Regions:
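Conserved catalytic-core segments centered on acid/base and nucleophilic motifs
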Residues: 1-2, 52
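Short, small-residue-biased leader/transition segments that mark boundaries at the very start
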Residues: 3-8
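Short internal beta-strands
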Residues: 9-14, 93-94
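Conserved phosphate- and dinucleotide-binding cores of soluble alpha/beta proteins
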Residues: 19-201
Length: 203
């Protein structure tokens, strides 16, 4: 049913189906079509993507994202720029911290069993792979989604909009950020169904 409501694409060429991870990353089960990569990127560059979901390595106070350079290690941006620049909406998804983070859930609440060693939300990213300033200039909606908090880019900065049930805003979010996010009142609670091992009942 959900597959009739959306069509998932991967930069390697699959159109539709269920994208695979791990060693099978780039493939898809039951894909409707397989395009060659240049054709897939023509689709991206032409603005064919409604919603782009990408990884979250580093974010800063201006909404910039870095996925391309970390100290002496240069990962490069790959197709990241093509996908993000012409998508109608962009969502960056990943864990709130990195390096050993362990989480569990109980009774619809998130529990941080072991905090990550590295903060991902820092004052200034080392290299700008995605520009928050440019996104605001062109009116592109941007969200940053983690297991414990959701942020939104607005004209005057990054806002904390949602917090997972069971999470303390000060000690488990703000204390692990290199900047203080803006808040438009009390952040909403993320839907507790996300943190329960049962059918969500999506409509």
């Amino acid at each position: 049913r959900r597959q009739r409501q959306m069509c998932i694409r991967d930069r390697a060429g699959p159109v539709g189906g269920v994208p695979q991870g791990g060693p099978q990353f780039g493939g898809a089960v039951n894909a409707q079509a397989i395009l060659d990569q240049p054709a897939q990127f023509d689709f991206y560059d032409g603005g064919g993507v409604d919603d782009a979901f990408l990884g979250l390595a580093q974010a800063d106070k201006d909404g910039n994202i870095n996925v391309s350079k970390f100290g002496p290690r240069i990962a490069g941006c790959g197709g990241f720029v093509n996908i993000t620049q012409n998508a109608k909406r962009v969502y960056y998804c990943g864990t709130f911290t990195a390096g050993g983070l362990k989480c569990s859930t109980k009774d619809g609440k998130l529990i941080i069993d072991q905090e990550g060693k590295s903060d991902k939300f820092i004052d200034t990213v080392e290299q700008i792979t995605f520009s928050g300033k440019y996104a605001n200039k062109v009116g592109q909606p941007v969200m940053y989604i983690t297991e414990r908090a959701v942020f939104e880019l607005r004209e005057d900065g990054v806002y904390l909009t949602e917090v997972a049930p069971g999470i303390d805003i000060q000690t488990q979010i703000l204390d692990h950020m290199g900047f203080v996010p803006k808040m438009d009142g009390e952040p909403k609670l993320m839907d507790e169904r996300i943190f329960k091992d049962e059918i969500m009942g999506l409509e």
